[in-house]
Regions:
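Intrinsically disordered, low-complexity repeat and linker tracts
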Residues: 1-12, 20-21, 112-141, 148-150, ...
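Contiguous beta-strand segments within globular domains
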Residues: 17-33, 148-160
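Exposed aromatic-hydrophobic patches
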Residues: 31, 79-88, 160, 208-216
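Short glycine/proline/serine/threonine-rich loop/turn segments at secondary-structure transition edges
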Residues: 86-98, 215-227
Length: 294
């Protein structure tokens, strides 16, 4: 009687979590406990990722997400790990289930399957990929941090943008432009939008970046401007993907107010004063007895 081999697997993130944030390089670790192995026998464990809802193999760039591990059993009971690293950018909200098969390689030409664990409903084998949600918060001021500024020819608005949930190593572009609050319309100066952008590679999950807008604000007395921002993921430069935005015309933090021009009172016309002939001035000559020391 040959002892049956039992197989039990648990899939997690590298940190042992059952959820992983969607990203371009995600790793699932499957810990496989085997019992009933024959010492000295060569085995191969083969695993792959399944989409739970579809009950179908996960295919990324036309390929199965799979891996294998070959070992010689040094004990009847062993624990081995198989890792799967793949691009999970588009898998937010999906449950992935790891399937495993164990082969006996005693005859390398004819591997024999001796055990498997393929249960699409098994929670232990399931990992949830969660949506990456990028939060954006912006504050617009002038260079000195003021929210109320003088209208003038050369005005700079600085928008300080706080981003959370970025994917480290990903190239992003922040695009911003100025809106007229009362009109809820883009600010056009000489027929052009007042806009700017900033491209960067995220080196942290949370970052603070600044975008500056310099323009002629001569005609904007009393107007309120609101800065709008959109963040794009440039992983595929041909298809930038908008990942978050902050476009709220009522947002105080994003609003700048230009001061009203002070009303200059019109001067009343002065009545014509008749020209008085110039009185000739005598030169100031020191008078005698004046006590002036000559």
């Amino acid at each position: 009687y040959e002892k049956e081999i039992s197989i039990h697997t648990t899939a997690t993130s590298k940190d042992g979590e059952k959820t992983i944030l969607a990203g371009k390089e995600v790793t699932i670790v499957d810990t496989v406990k085997l019992d009933g192995l024959k010492k000295g026998t060569k085995y191969q464990l083969k695993g792959w990722q399944m989409l739970k809802e579809e009950n179908a193999e996960l295919i990324i760039d036309g390929k199965r997400v799979e891996n294998d591990y070959t070992f010689v059993a040094d004990d009847e009971a062993m624990k081995v790990e198989i890792t799967y690293t793949f691009n999970a950018s588009e898998l937010g909200g999906k449950n992935l289930v790891t399937f495993e098969e164990l082969y006996d390689l005693s005859n390398p030409d004819e591997p024999v399957k001796v055990a498997e664990h393929k249960d699409i409903e098994d929670d232990g084998q399931t990992v949830l990929i969660t949506e990456r949600i990028i939060k954006i918060h912006t504050t617009a001021t002038d260079k000195d941090g003021n929210k109320e500024i003088e209208a003038g020819k050369d005005v700079t608005i600085v928008d300080t943008v706080t981003l959370e949930g970025l994917e480290i190593g990903t190239k992003y572009q922040l695009k911003g432009w100025q809106m007229l609050k009362e009109e809820n319309a883009e600010l056009l100066i000489n027929g052009k939008r007042v806009e700017n952008d900033y491209t960067f590679i995220a080196d942290k999950e949370s970052m603070k970046v600044e975008v500056a807008f310099t323009f002629d604000a001569t005609s904007l007395d009393g107007k309120q401007l609101v800065t709008f921002e959109e963040l794009y993921d440039l992983s595929n430069p041909d298809e930038p993907k908008k990942v978050t935005e902050h476009r709220d015309i009522e947002d105080e933090g994003q609003t700048i107010t230009f001061k009203e021009k002070p009303e200059v009172p019109e001067e009343p016309e002065k009545p014509e004063t008749p020209q008085t002939p110039d009185t000739p001035h005598k030169p100031d000559s020191p008078k005698t007895g004046d006590g002036t020391n000559l």
